[in-house]
């Protein structure tokens, strides 16, 4: 009884050890991409899953790595720490790293990891090799492509040498097609990678455009098939995945790998502790348990094609691999001679004339006669241009505004003698308009195609235009301030020639700053990618400068801001001027305020990343708004007064006739003589009081002419000679009247002191009344004129 119990315990322990052993087997599979590529990596993963199912492996891992450095870096710690039993290095890109780690632990007693790698070298105690005849799969695929093609043109997309893959498999595809049709037209591209969707799709589309109706590939994914289906062409699956399971009848042919048939026996051998490793080989085989490839056809493939395909596959199965057509054909000898390749000479095997070994086959890279190599494919970058409609819109709008501005300049010349134009200085008005035209031209250049010259020209034009426009506005404001902010009413002469240097100084500062920007800013056109939601292979020509140029640009903006602040201050100082022809402060201030407001929008836009096309739209719109608003605000009132008032102004000082008061004084004061001076010794008329606190609107024309001359150029602002003579006569009459009144007052003073005091008081009262009348020159009314005439008459009666 005891023996039975012991026996049962031993059986239980043995069973537990077996179960424990099964659970502890660990397998790691290396991939070059994710399993959703519907290609090579997906099929490797399918083999891993089937092995885990068949052997009840709980710890079956995946690791996506590529290349020696990445593979070695991530794999070594796992091997050292996780007690992995089997590492499947699925890609040739994993080969070197896996071999290096296997070499490190080949004699280790603690790390017993086995490595399954791609290749056909001699195995070791911890290194297992597996290879599959990829050439036969490509050969039979090319055979099918030539059978199915209706145009006699087929294409191919290959990784090429850039991916450490020669074009021997491209050659195998072409050999299969040539077996069917010796005159087949064959075109192929290299894309430099096993997995590059963008290049694959673009290269496939190019091949389809050339007339190829069947396109194969040796890539890891199905991008070639996707591109063909999208264009309405049938696709073939040549990357080892059963594409028809996904795409149905859009795929007319595909072959798939069955890695389970090889991974499973290898894993079982490793689990059993076998270290006497061997080399494994996968290909077409009559033994279904060893047949690596499975072919699937669409309904469009007729029976004749199927029969030919089956016949050719049976030929490959029954023939020694070294005698297959891609190893042996009549083109090999000449090709080997031209490219220094050795012909096959295998001991114990009788080969046809003109064969190469598998190693020599793998070194085939240059195309054979009949193969058209299109080169390493480079995706053509597509330029995204600035919207043509917006270009036309801005250009046409700006052109119309330029035409209107030119008409305004002609209007300035035509109506230069009218008070509204004459009082504002026609020369400066044309400067302002010229600045506007320069800005408009800069905007047209701004929306045009970008190049180095355009990048520099647009900034030069816009900044010079604004300097001319704003500088002229500020200088005009400054002159108005100096003349009207004159409490002593001294005669101040500020000619245009005195103001030109100030406008020139504004331009010189602008030119210096722009010269610095041009010289050190490296302002040039570049092909920019990754902006404005552009596609991966789209670009836009944009202007770019370095940090020095950006700093200079900010300095230019600061200069404009300072100029605007000066203009705003001066326009505020002259807000009290009541004569409309001279009072441009409101118009200029409104212009400067509009510009300042726009700068608050422009400056943040210039210093923050924005959509380039939107940035151009905002900047050009702001430029048009600023310039057009400035010109309309300044010139619309002037031309309106020209067309409504003609040669007359809004103030009587512009009318070349005397007021009623001046006429009455001229008639009653002819006996007076001598000039009349105020307390400061300045020449004044009877309409000015001794306090000199205001300018009378109802003045004699000599004063009006004198004030006007301070604002305008002598050649265009003086009255004609006849009017000047008339004004001088009126002045003389007024002076005579004043002298006569003074003489009469003196006589009255000598006769009676009391009367004299009364008269003086009356005269003072009258003078005060006159002063009160004169202080309201900008708003004359009939009641004040009549009251002033009555006071003048009473004064003359008393003096008599």
From Swiss-Prot:
Extracellular side: 22-392, 448-463, 521-551, 608-616
Keyword Signal: yes
Subcellular location as annotated: Membrane
Composition bias, Basic and acidic residues: 781-791
Induction behaviour: Down-regulated by phagocytic stimuli.
Family from the record: In the N-terminal section; belongs to the BMP lipoprotein family. In the C-terminal section; belongs to the G-protein coupled receptor 3 family. GABA-B receptor subfamily.
Keyword Coiled coil assigned: no
Annotated Low complexity bias: 733-774
Glycosylation sites: 69, 107, 166, 258, 276, 302, 345, 546
Gene Ontology cellular-component terms listed: plasma membrane
A single BP term in Gene Ontology: response to folic acid
Coarse class of the protein's main subcellular location: membrane
Protein name per its UniProtKB record: Metabotropic glutamate receptor-like protein C
Biased amino acid composition, Acidic residues: 718-732
Signal peptide residues on this chain, from the entry's feature table: 1-21
Membrane-spanning segments: 393-413, 427-447, 464-484, 500-520, 552-572, 587-607, 617-637
Gene Ontology molecular function, alphabetical: G protein-coupled receptor activity
Disordered: annotated span: 658-694, 718-800
Topology within the bilayer: Multi-pass membrane protein
Pfam families linked: 7tm_3, Bmp
Keywords: G-protein coupled receptor, Glycoprotein, Membrane, Receptor, Signal, Transducer, Transmembrane, Transmembrane helix
Stretches assigned to the Cytoplasmic side: 414-426, 485-499, 573-586, 638-800
